[in-house]
Amino acid sequence: MTILRKTHPLMKMVNHAFIDLPTPANISGWWNFGSLLGLCLIIQIASGLFLAMHYTPDTLTAFSSVTHICRDVNYGWLIRYMHANGASLFFICLYLHIGRGIYYGSYSYTETWNIGIILLFLTMATAFMGYVLPWGQMSFWGATVITNLLSAIPYIGTDLVEWIWGGFSVDKATLNRFFAFHFILPFIIAATAMVHLLFLHETGSNNPLGIPSDCDKIPFHPYYTTKDFLGMVLLLAFFFTMVLFFPDLLGDPDNYSPANPLNTPPHIKPEWYFLFAYAILRSIPNKLGGVIALIMSILVLALLPHIQTSKQRSLMFRPISQFLFWLLVADVLALTWIGGQPVEPPFIIIGQIASLLYFTIILILMPIAGIIENKMLKW
């Protein structure tokens, strides 16, 4: 008798993806973040669904409906803070996942990598629109500033901005459509993640050595299901510590004031996970140039498979590239810090140097390091 999971049409798909999947025997904890991102997405969709039941996307009542959720709905405060901090956790896992991909050369799987970049853009769009919904001061002004960037597009810019706003300023129509998009996008993300997995399972997982592992594979279950489960337990422990003890640590105090179009906050800034891109945007004095740099700060990842010069895939045995990788990590952290600072000396010049360094490391120094390391192999 054949096992049901190997014959049933639906269970067969699950079996090939999560049970009998041949997996490299030596992948480390850095490979846990894919499943952790899945957990984050489930947390966000579940908590978001319950929030949507009580939220009203109207400029007059949006702010008070969020207050009502926190005060009057059973465990509403918990659901709200789970959703807000869940977004931060999502981006922490996302950036670690991308960092792992760069370090171990996972970008060589071009289709998987490119769909990952699309997932990053979708997640950033979802998070931005979600930040607008509570209709606090930073929600309103963040939406105004970021949507206004589209006016930098020549000829059609102004029309495009007014089309997105649904009027001549960020108002009820904008809030309404942002709520609609914020609700539907996570399901599109979930579907795209399935495609991401589909392409990954076509090639199989990479491993820390960056070498083919066909000769040494083990089934995903029970070895990596238990490993993923441990990762999830640790993630949830960290998550609930944040939610229950430091719920506002990563938020902006300005968002506890209702949106006021007549009063501009002293420092308009997005959530912490966009600050590095915001710093790159601000470091260029030209509006269109800044928008192009902002988009390129993410799109530059798509160039990685095409500018790799090294004969080795992973950075594990490449000391120069390792140094440049950690320099890049430090640079992104510096950009994150700068993005949260006011636009005044010395922050302006630090931001410009850090932005220049970001693109220089990825586009120039890393390919050069690869060539040098190839020569070192022959010594």
Curated annotation (Swiss-Prot):
The keyword Ubl conjugation does not apply. It is found in: Mitochondrion inner membrane. This is Cytochrome b. Component of the ubiquinol-cytochrome c reductase complex (complex III or cytochrome b-c1 complex) that is part of the mitochondrial respiratory chain. The b-c1 complex mediates electron transfer from ubiquinol to cytochrome c. Contributes to the generation of a proton gradient across the mitochondrial membrane that is then used for ATP synthesis. Keywords: Electron transport, Heme, Iron, Membrane, Metal-binding, Mitochondrion, Mitochondrion inner membrane, Respiratory chain, Transmembrane, Transmembrane helix, Transport, Ubiquinone. A ubiquinone binds at residue 201. It comes from Dipodomys venustus. The gene is MT-CYB. GO terms for cellular component: mitochondrial inner membrane; respiratory chain complex III. Its cofactor is heme b.
